[in-house]
Every structure is written in C-alpha cells, then in structure tokens.
C-alpha cells in the first residue's frame, strides 16, 4: 500500500470508535489467504459530506506489514464507475511520486478493464498475496490479478 493509502487507512482505523457497526466487507476472502486472520481495523471514508465506502483491513495475528499478505475490503456506500475507481487509484500512485508513465498507463489500462461499476452495497476486495501480487474480488468472485510487485507496493 502506498503512503497515501496508509495515511487514509490509519485515519479509517482511528475512526473505528466512531463507526463501531462498520461491517466487514468480505471476511471469507481474508480467511482463504491469511492464517490466524484478524481484523486490524475498519472505518468509513467520507469525501466532503458523502460516505463513499467502509474499509476493513485484515492481517495475520502477528500484525499488519506492507511486505506481507493482507486483505483490504471496501464495501461501497454509493454508486461509482469502475473507470473512476481505476483513475483515482492511478492518481494516488502518481501522487506518491511514481513517475514511470509507461507503467502507470499499463496499470491504468489493467484496472479500467478489471474494476466494475459498483453500486451501494457492492464490495471490492484486494489481496496482497505471498508472491507480492494483488488479487481483486467483487463480492466472493475473483475478477482479476495484477502480477506486479511494484504495483502491489504502491497500491
């Protein structure tokens, strides 16, 4: 996860006290990939006055590390276009200082093809696996993979 996402997620984790009922989006996926899984935190991302999604982060009981497997699940609270989700993801990676235009374009193409439009109640889940790949799910169904450790590190 990139610095921006870590900062956003840290704020979400701190907001758990304010959103104790924030449901986990898909704990079954976390259990498939993580031994002795634990929920690290959850919270709601709000942009201006719109609630966008509930995020839940899962890691092994030993704790979250960016270089080890983890699962980040987002339960959407509004309708969004998949292309907009992909575009925002690439913008965040670019804002981290990543400037390789060819790789950004490749990642943008992959994510735009991969991310579906979402509606209130849909969930998207990203898994950072042992090999450093990012595996994406919509609900319980796998929708694709980005097999690029640099992408995974920045995502």
Which residues are covered by each model-predicted region?
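Terminal leader/tail segments of proteins
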Residues: 23-155
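Bacterial N-terminal signal peptides
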Residues: 7-17
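Positively charged n-region of N-terminal signal peptides that target proteins for export
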Residues: 1-4
């Amino acid at each position: 996860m990139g610095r921006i996402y870590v900062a956003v997620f840290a704020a979400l984790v701190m907001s758990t006290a304010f959103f104790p009922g924030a449901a986990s989006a898909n704990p079954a996926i976390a259990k498939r990939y993580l031994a002795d899984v634990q929920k690290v935190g959850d919270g709601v991302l709000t942009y201006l006055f719109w609630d966008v999604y509930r995020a839940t982060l899962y890691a092994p009981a030993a704790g979250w590390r960016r270089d080890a497997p983890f699962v980040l699940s987002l339960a959407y609270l509004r309708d969004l276009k998949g292309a907009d989700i992909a575009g925002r993801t690439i913008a965040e990676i670019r804002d981290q200082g990543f400037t390789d235009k060819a790789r950004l374009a490749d990642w943008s193409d992959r994510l735009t093809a991969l991310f579906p439009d979402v509606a209130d109640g849909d969930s998207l889940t990203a898994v950072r696996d042992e090999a450093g790949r990012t595996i994406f799910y919509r609900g319980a169904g796998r929708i694709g993979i980005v097999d690029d450790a640099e992408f995974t590190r920045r995502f």
